[in-house]
Amino acid sequence: MYEYLHGLITAVYPDHVVVDVNGVGYLVNTANPYRYEVSATAVTIYVYQAVSDTAQTLYGFSDFAEKQLFLKLINVNGIGPKSALAILANPDHQGLMMAIKTNDTGFLTKFPGVGKKTAGQIVLDLQNKLDDLAPATDDNTLFTPEVAPTTTENPQLADALAALTALGYRETAVKKITAQLRQFNGQTTNDYLSEGLRLLTK
């Protein structure tokens, strides 16, 4: 079982990154792949390895606190790794924990794959189990901002929309916020993705 990987990001996709560790490329599913960039500088990604009869899957996190929150979420009945990643994609982890503590199921049902029953289960299982967990933060120190192109075809926006779909948000919901995102003055894919998540969960 792996605790973390330390290596080079060699590729970034809407739902995962590839981490090269001593010449071996690891496919790591992350809540926000565009937090990272292809770089010659090594990064550390905390990981959780899920093993099934058909596959071994790695899930990656920006810090230990985010990993701990993920582990708590997947222990809730009805929440799998993919749903947990979709929840963690919203960078406001402190707001997430506050929603759980205050029984704000309306906030929780805004995440893909979380209905009223599952939201209630999250509150029931975790309401009194988060006090020992420091809020995970959206660490952007590993990401170097890029200047968004001025053409109508914005690759950063396109990548962010693809990432939202990969997280499980319905295509109709993503389309509804696309016009607002086009008006958003984002610099990077991470900017557009964070704003998209804010719009989808407000």
Curated annotation (Swiss-Prot):
One of its GO terms (molecular function) is ATP binding. Residues 152-202 are annotated as: Domain III. GO terms for biological process: DNA recombination; DNA repair. SUPFAM superfamilies: DNA helicase RuvA subunit, C-terminal domain (SSF46929), Nucleic acid-binding proteins (SSF50249), RuvA domain 2-like (SSF47781). It is found in: Cytoplasm. Its main location: cytoplasm. Keywords: Cytoplasm, DNA damage, DNA recombination, DNA repair, DNA-binding. Has three domains with a flexible linker between the domains II and III and assumes an 'L' shape. Domain III is highly mobile and contacts RuvB. The RuvA-RuvB-RuvC complex processes Holliday junction (HJ) DNA during genetic recombination and DNA repair, while the RuvA-RuvB complex plays an important role in the rescue of blocked DNA replication forks via replication fork reversal (RFR). RuvA specifically binds to HJ cruciform DNA, conferring on it an open structure. The RuvB hexamer acts as an ATP-dependent pump, pulling dsDNA into and through the RuvAB complex. HJ branch migration allows RuvC to scan DNA until it finds its consensus sequence, where it cleaves and resolves the cruciform DNA. Homotetramer. Forms an RuvA(8)-RuvB(12)-Holliday junction (HJ) complex. HJ DNA is sandwiched between 2 RuvA tetramers; dsDNA enters through RuvA and exits via RuvB. An RuvB hexamer assembles on each DNA strand where it exits the tetramer. Each RuvB hexamer is contacted by two RuvA subunits (via domain III) on 2 adjacent RuvB subunits; this complex drives branch migration. In the full resolvosome a probable DNA-RuvA(4)-RuvB(12)-RuvC(2) complex forms which resolves the HJ. This is Holliday junction branch migration complex subunit RuvA.
